[in-house]
């Protein structure tokens, strides 16, 4: 915020005086309808904005609610209203949709007209109070970057929107508009959305979170009302964001979208017939998961937390779910627990075997011997202690499955991100797999290493036959699959777990390694598309590897014995490690 402070230097004779100017005033305009599920987070992030609240005024309107939106807004304002320069909150308490609406997500002309009237009222209110800026923002936007408002003001642009991220291709700007005023696909859209080109970009449309400078004379011509446009020029729909965009166009005022920073997140508006308890709550889970991935936590003020219900937890119809995590990686564990709370997953933390606690002697004493001739395909090195610990962690789970007679288990690592609609998609994958039968393992997340297409499983829309793959981010394994993996006594001919699995389903390119394993009958499938991806890739900021960045084993000297007959029993006795939305050409909306 210090970067925004303006200083004026006055020189009088030999004296020089520096004076500090106050920051511009901003009126924040919000329309609220049926947003009880988003408001606790929306208000928390709005409150977190690093901008002087005594330079901000709030203008909030709400009507036709069927939830606790008004109650939540009142609760937040009760605590915060005194912090802001002024608060203007009006609402209609009668519940239910308009008589002309088919559903609460139906956008008809009456609804558009009401929103147009309210936004025009907000614009006029900002002008009447001589605000320097008006910031229109929807109640399902989460401005996770606390510097958003200040950074936008620094741009000194007449109309600017912070680019917002959704759980798909949807965002709050258009790069093209058709002759009949609707969304047009362009090559530039994805370049901006994917940060392939970064900066401030002139576009024909911004919406959902828009900052307007009221000190620019031409902005007096901006309007949401069709009647205020030049006579005879507009023949488009009754739609607030389109009319506003065209009023800017007719007035010669450029609109910009700014993607120089990650500013925040946006919900995709519901289509007519879609519901808040269904689709929108799933979308909220997706977006909140994105935020947890990026920041490690959510902003939720204590007085608003009572409006957020706990998500009931289950095991996705499986016998058990395990998360492998090193005890010392508390930040990963904390992040994953937040994901499980959001997704409603009942998961047991399974302490990983820590490679840092292993030594050549410990490994040898545990009965572990290494596959003759093994070297990492990329780094041409023997196994690291981290890779040994990783294998033992998975191995211990397979042993526990057999001991406890667990029929189907999901094994998760702790450096994963969940794809949108994870629960629904996971249930779909599992339903297909059980209906078809004949599988031992299903990858939920992996790195595919073969270029050729993988064959679809007959009768399934979600499953393919797994080819040579790396990573064990997440997989479902059956009891029979665990028994197959244990029967080969892999600790007597050890190699990394993500090499062992493809060998066991007989799809590994190294015939020399494969020849050491006889019963390669593991039936392995993969979800398609995948349900899990890594949080970071090699080289990314924040990337940490507990397998690569660890000591390597001492390569055995010629003549050393490579196998012990009872490696699993010795290990057990050691006690170590136990215990996408796309864009539509029609206008999609979310306000009142």
UniProtKB/Swiss-Prot annotation:
Keyword check for Transferase, yes or no.
Answer: yes
**Mind telling me which Pfam families this protein's record contains?**
Glyco_tranf_2_4 (PF13704), Glyco_transf_25 (PF01755)
What is the protein's species of origin? Anopheles gambiae
Keyword match Glycoprotein = yes
Protein's name according to its UniProt entry: Glycosyltransferase 25 family member
What the record says about family reads:
Belongs to the glycosyltransferase 25 family.
Where do Basic and acidic residues bias regions lie?
552-563, 579-592
What are its E.C. numbers? 2.-.-.-
The domain of life for this entry's organism is: Eukaryota
Q: Which GO terms describe its molecular function?
A: procollagen galactosyltransferase activity
